[in-house]
């Protein structure tokens, strides 16, 4: 497969899709439904927990292993170095190296999302392969903290991912959601999304993934290298 990737870009909420920077085409928003149906209950994440320690704090996301088994397995394999990948169109295969450690969040948009997982650091990179979308109609962008695959069109998932800061229903049905991050993680996403950035939404001060840990059922959470500061104690009342 030719691996001349176009940038995977997160546009503003008026477009609300992740599209190649060079593409003039824009995905249409869905039409209003003609009938109202009762949606099924949203599924709960039941898979391993992804812990992403960044230079601005920890992101903790439980995975939807039943709804997105390919995406979850792909992320875990890259994170732990058990999955083969390539940066030169498959000429040189790599395995045993942790893919995500050290990569940047190369694109951040306040009030929308943060995007990372690109070894090129500019939205054009990936692991040297694609895999298909896994879209569950009952798993939507109705809440903050969704962990999803970025893409440049249908079935072009690789290594790039994003985490939403707010609900973004405009993305429903277009991207593979494979995790849900907790409330503290959404606070970290908000902090990252609001850093100073250039015209391409790239942080002026790099925000880096320091380490990714996969926590399976029964395993303890790793120590947080940068735990949140404890609230200041209230001064004692004067007598």
Segments from the language model and where they lie:
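Bacterial N-terminal signal peptides
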Residues: 11-21
